[in-house]
Swiss-Prot record:
A molecular function GO annotation: hydroxymethylbilane synthase activity
HAMAP family per the UniProt record, alphabetical: Porphobil_deam
Catalytic activity, EC: 2.5.1.61
InterPro entries: HemC, Porphobilin_deaminase_cofac_BS, Porphobilin_deaminase_N, Porphobilinogen_deaminase_C, Porphobilinogen_deaminase_C_sf
A matching Pfam family: Porphobil_deamC
Matches recorded under Gene3D superfamilies: Periplasmic binding protein-like II, Porphobilinogen deaminase, C-terminal domain
GO cellular component terms listed in the entry, alphabetical order: cytoplasm
Annotated protein name in UniProt: Porphobilinogen deaminase
Cofactor(s) required, per the database record: dipyrromethane
Misc note: The porphobilinogen subunits are added to the dipyrromethane group.
Role description: Tetrapolymerization of the monopyrrole PBG into the hydroxymethylbilane pre-uroporphyrinogen in several discrete steps.
């Protein structure tokens, strides 16, 4: 058994919360381990002047940490799973999917207005094309404004009066104790989340069996089924965090239900579909369900929507 572990993480407040949470959970199970953090600045942390959709680079928040993992400078990397590309670099693997926090998105508004009660032509801050597409499908009058930076930075910009409302993931808002600022939690029939939203992905080297064995204790089986289904769907659609794709899977007693959305950036076209599979006994079967739903979306015309988006990115 190893005596020391080094966790690689970004330095944002939310990333540090995630890494400290992972450290605490591992220490609870393995009190003899000496666990330290190594902070890594990623491309996504540096390039703050451009919208994520314009940078067009997969792994903006992960690949720099993965370089340290491949070089054996760290033993594991802790990521927000929604930031992790669906294909990991050769020699690396997502070993654990931690138990998922609430996956929904939230609205933060100036006077507590809910989404549909926001004023005409309201300025909504989000860096996500997925959110933009679904917002504009409901309210074409909204002006969508790009916002970058960590959660504290975003709240500072919002409080300075730049926007009428801001959309964020509930998980991050809750973890950093901003829950009292939430005006509305959006249900999945209104806003489907990003693939993997609310879960942490713990990445290790494939050949580091000792670390994989240690980290595997943090894996949450239901979350793994759900996230592997969602990630398989995204992989088959050849999407990423810069593409308007949303998905949410639930899994209970061997039954997986997967909802998915693909839309145009302007919100004028939106496809939704779902699939239910029973008797699942392995995460690989969950992935097969994700691929099956992706194929159905492609038949509906998702390929035309996504091809058009890629031309302009």
């Amino acid at each position: 058994m190893k005596k020391q572990l080094i966790i690689g993480t970004r330095s944002s407040p939310l990333a540090l919360w995630q890494a400290e949470f992972t450290k605490a959970e591992l220490s609870r199970h393995y009190p003899e381990l000496d666990i330290t953090l190594k902070l890594v600045k990623t491309t996504g942390d540096v390039l703050l002047d451009s919208p994520l959709s314009k940078i067009g680079d997969m792994g903006l928040f992960t690949k720099d940490i993965e370089k340290h993992l491949i070089a054996k400078e760290i033993d594991l990397a802790v990521h927000s799973l929604k930031d992790v590309p669906t294909s990991t670099p050769e020699g690396l693997i997502i070993t654990s999917f931690t138990e998922r926090e609430d996956t929904r998105d939230v609205i933060i508004s100036r006077s507590g207005e809910t989404l549909l009660n926001l004023p005409q032509n309201a300025r909504i801050a989000t860096s996500s094309l997925r959110r933009m597409s679904q917002l504009l499908s409901m309210r074409p009058d909204f002006e969508i404004c790009d916002i970058r930076g960590n959660l504290n930075t975003r709240f500072k910009k919002f409080d300075e009066g730049e926007f009428d409302a801001m959309m964020l993931a509930y998980a991050g808002v809750f973890r950093l104790k901003f829950s009292d600022r939430i005006s509305e939690i959006l249900p999945h029939d209104v806003m489907l989340p990003a693939v993997g939203q609310g879960a942490l992905g713990i990445e290790t080297r494939v050949d580091d069996e000792q670390t994989r064995e240690i980290v595997r204790i943090l894996n949450h089986s239901n979350t793994e089924y759900c996230c592997r289904a969602e990630r398989a769907l995204l992989r088959h659609l050849q999407g990423g965090c810069q593409i308007p794709i949303g998905a949410y899977a639930s899994f209970k007693n061997g039954t997986l239900k997967l909802l998915a959305f693909v839309g145009s950036v302007n919100g004028k076209i939106g496809l939704r579909n779902e699939i239910t599979k029973t008797g699942l006994v392995s995460p690989e079967q969950a992935e097969e369900a994700g691929i099956e739903l992706a194929k159905e979306l492609l038949k509906q015309g998702a390929d035309e929507i996504l091809s058009e988006i890629r031309k302009t990115r």
